[in-house]
């Protein structure tokens, strides 16, 4: 089956969700617990108690300091969201670890593209939405605990969304927004590629490969720049006379970067198409 059928794809999505819903619920519970414990750490364990802050700096100073603690929970929640998305990307095909699971999934009456897109869509949508809901639920539990113990009620959700949407509010050039989105998609595509390539310990091996590749890239670029005598005094972004000035190399980097991102996703799909039912190797090729 080589053609893509939307109705068949939607039925496969529904079937995949029904068979994996317990896993998603378990992830949601774990994420909520981790984020709630992190909220308690930032607001109650590190720093000073609220009563001591009121005694030392007065109510206004205590609220101002406690607000900075809550902002810390929002920053942690945002970092946790991105790490969770990368972690999920590396385990895109975790439902195919065993031979029986692999045989069952590869025999689904859908095309290879549909088999590839089903876990990808679930991974992006369910994991992304689930992590966001888990953060807000953990924030609500912290606020409830603050209210029950007589603390000032300060929500962390507004700061979370302010940081999350800041690159898209028009206050920065669209090139900067494209770079931020591309930076995340680049790592997401790498972890999906690693999750497709490695059969075991996908997240760990992919992370190690990225670190090694990064150091090799930096060393190679440094050697080329030093050997060629190319000037490093390039102002990629400048602000002059109320106007942003973007160097032409930024657009070249964006085009090449998004091209490599598309290549990573395509390679991941090709590796998936070559997966074998019986495989005891560390790689899926």
Model regions and ranges:
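Hydrophobic alpha-helical transmembrane segments of membrane proteins
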Residues: 1-103, 112-285
């Amino acid at each position: 089956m080589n053609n893509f059928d939307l109705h068949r794809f939607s039925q496969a999505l529904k079937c995949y969700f029904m068979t994996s819903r317990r896993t998603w619920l378990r992830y949601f519970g774990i994420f909520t617990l981790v984020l709630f414990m992190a909220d308690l750490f930032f607001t109650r364990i590190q720093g000073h108690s609220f009563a001591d802050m009121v005694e030392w700096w007065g109510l206004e100073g205590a609220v101002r300091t406690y607000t900075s603690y809550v902002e810390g929970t929002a920053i942690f929640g945002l970092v946790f969201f991105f790490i969770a998305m990368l972690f999920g990307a590396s385990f895109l095909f975790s439902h195919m670890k065993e031979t029986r699971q692999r045989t069952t999934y590869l025999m689904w009456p859908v095309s290879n593209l549909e088999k590839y897109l089903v876990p990808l869509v679930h991974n992006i949508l369910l994991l992304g939405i689930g992590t966001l809901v888990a953060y807000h639920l953990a924030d609500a539990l912290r606020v409830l605990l603050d209210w029950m113990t007589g603390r000032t009620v300060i929500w962390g959700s507004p700061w979370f969304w302010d940081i999350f949407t800041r690159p898209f509010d028009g206050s920065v050039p669209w090139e900067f927004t494209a770079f931020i989105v591309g930076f995340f998609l680049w790592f997401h595509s790498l972890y999906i590629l690693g999750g497709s390539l490695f059969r075991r310990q996908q997240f760990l091996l992919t992370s190690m490969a990225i670190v090694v590749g990064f150091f090799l890239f930096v060393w190679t670029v440094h050697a080329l720049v030093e050997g060629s005598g190319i000037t490093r005094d390039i102002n990629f972004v400048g602000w002059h006379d109320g106007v942003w000035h973007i160097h032409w190399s930024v657009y070249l980097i964006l085009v090449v970067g998004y091209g490599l991102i598309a290549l990573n996703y395509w390679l991941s799909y090709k590796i998936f198409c070559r997966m074998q039912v019986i495989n005891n190797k560390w790689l899926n090729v």
